[in-house]
């Protein structure tokens, strides 16, 4: 096996204009592959489930906000691992790297608790989303089976965060590429051939993620890099755990807040009927792919800033943000032009019903232009997290996203019960969040604060 350490990206030296895309693009490709299997599963469900195609699509789509809530909350913790390990690498603190790596692996065990809680409360949680009675049996079945994959999903994401903290981004991509092919193959067997429907899609996901998590674990056992895992050293280190939770928990809450707000919105969408649910589900799949493309630059910003902060290269931290904003802006503009321009054609791949395509296109035109705001607040929050400032972005997101979307659903939507109306809340809430995230960076000014702290320490 090739030494994975030789393939790492040096974050503290070299051209940021070159190294950030080298880091971000494999991360984006990994995230897109994660969504690709979901996209293809939606297509397979919609086209190979016979008369229940639209109902099955609605069942899977109605679960997206709920599964996103659980995944975002715990996967956000992996961002804490990323920052802590990257910062320790920048400081050349190999002891902390070792402790944080082994602590991170064991933190994924929380996935088993999620399974237990989810299996008990599956139907009540779906009922809270106003899932229609005709959709409930399939939606509940999908959720119960999907939750079995939670430990593998969490383990994979913690392992990926460990590799990325040292600049190895292709390894998680390679592992997921193999499991994605497996996932698609199993979907094609379980749904059209065995007629397992939504349960087949969920089972395929569980098997595929188990393979990818096992692959990365084996790689961590064999790697020659500083993040090598030794089974006898697997233990929860209190200091490492505290640092990871301090950064990761607010990051997880920040991600979960979006999911909570989307659950409220999904509840309003569900009240408009199965056809609207199916159309929204198809458009939502596109959003997940494009969002992850932009989010990869935020992850790059966090990791690069984390390492350079540890190495005390503060000017390079500021330049990292500037590069991520420019390159992320180009990606956002391209995404907006392509998806809005070809939206109807792309949506028709999910479901050929003209009415569903038209409804889905309303969502496309409402949300995708706001991707400029997403690019802005993601990079700003990623920059702050790289300095270990994680609570402020979480609070801004909670107030701006949850506050505005809750108000809209409960105070505005009841008076104008249309799909177009509920979609208007997205650009409004995203724009407000971006504005206050920029203000937070300007007020916190972490580079100036760092220099002032260093000057004070030197004077003493």
Tell where the protein language model's regions lie, with residue ranges.
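Small-residue hotspots at the loop-to-helix junctions and early N-terminal turns
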Residues: 54-65, 139, 143, 202, ...
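Transmembrane alpha-helix boundary and packing residues in multipass membrane permease domains
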Residues: 27, 31, 43, 83, ...
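Transmembrane helical elements of multi-pass membrane transporters/channels
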Residues: 22-42, 145, 156, 179, ...
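Short alpha-helical transmembrane segments in multi-pass integral membrane proteins
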Residues: 1-24, 85-149, 182, 193-249, ...
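Small-residue-rich hydrophobic transmembrane alpha-helices
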Residues: 57-116, 120, 153-172, 266, ...
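N-terminal transmembrane alpha-helices
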Residues: 11-43, 47-51, 65-80, 84, ...
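Helix-terminus/linker motif at the lipid-water interface of multi-pass membrane proteins
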Residues: 32, 36-58, 126-133, 189-196, ...
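Short runs within selected transmembrane alpha-helices of multi-pass transporters and secretion channels
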Residues: 75-78, 145-164, 172-180, 201-216, ...
């Amino acid at each position: 096996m090739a030494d994975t350490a030789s393939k790492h990206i040096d974050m503290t030296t070299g051209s940021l204009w070159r190294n950030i895309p080298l880091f971000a693009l494999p991360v984006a490709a990994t995230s897109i592959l994660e969504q690709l299997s979901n996209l293809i599963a939606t297509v397979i469900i919609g086209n190979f489930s016979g008369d229940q195609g639209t109902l099955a699509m609605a069942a899977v789509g109605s679960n997206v906000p709920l599964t996103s809530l659980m995944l975002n909350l715990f996967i956000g913790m992996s961002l804490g691992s990323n920052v802590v390990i990257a910062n320790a690498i920048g400081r050349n603190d190999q002891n902390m790297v070792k402790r944080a790596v082994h602590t991170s692996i064991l933190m994924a065990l929380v996935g088993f608790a999620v399974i237990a809680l989810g299996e008990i409360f599956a139907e009540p949680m779906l009922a809270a989303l106003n899932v229609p009675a005709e959709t409930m049996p399939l939606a509940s079945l999908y959720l119960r089976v999907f939750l079995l994959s939670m430990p593998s999903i969490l383990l994979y994401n913690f392992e990926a965060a460990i590799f990325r903290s040292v600049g190895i981004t292709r390894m998680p991509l390679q592992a997921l590429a193999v499991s994605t092919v497996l996932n698609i193959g199993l979907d094609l067997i379980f749904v059209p051939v065995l007629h397992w429907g939504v349960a087949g899609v969920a089972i395929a996901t569980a098997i595929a993620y188990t393979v990818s998590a096992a692959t990365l674990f084996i790689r961590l056992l064999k790697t020659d890099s500083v993040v090598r895992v030794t089974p006898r050293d697997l233990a929860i280190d209190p200091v490492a755990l505290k640092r990871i939770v301090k950064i990761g928990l607010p990051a997880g809450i920040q991600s979960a807040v979006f999911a909570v707000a989307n659950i409220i919105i999904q509840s309003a969408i569900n009240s408009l009927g199965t056809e609207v649910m199916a159309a929204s589900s198809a458009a939502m799949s596109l959003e997940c792919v494009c969002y992850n493309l932009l989010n990869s630059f935020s992850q790059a910003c966090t990791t690069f800033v984390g390492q350079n902060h540890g190495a005390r290269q503060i000017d390079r931290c500021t330049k990292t943000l500037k590069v991520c904003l420019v390159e992320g802006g180009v990606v956002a503009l391209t995404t907006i032009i392509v998806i809005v321009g070809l939206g109807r054609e792309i949506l028709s791949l999910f479901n050929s019903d003209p009415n569903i395509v038209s409804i889905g296109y309303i969502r496309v035109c409402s949300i995708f232009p706001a991707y400029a705001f997403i690019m802005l607040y993601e990079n700003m929050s990623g920059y702050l997290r790289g300095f270990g400032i994680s609570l402020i972005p979480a609070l801004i997101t909670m107030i701006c996203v949850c506050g505005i979307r809750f108000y809209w659903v409960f105070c505005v939507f009841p008076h104008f019960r249309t799909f177009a109306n509920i979609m208007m809340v997205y650009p409004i809430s995203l724009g407000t969040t971006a504005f206050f995230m920029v203000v937070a960076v300007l007020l916190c000014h972490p580079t100036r604060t760092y220099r002032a702290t260093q000057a004070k320490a030197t004077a003493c």
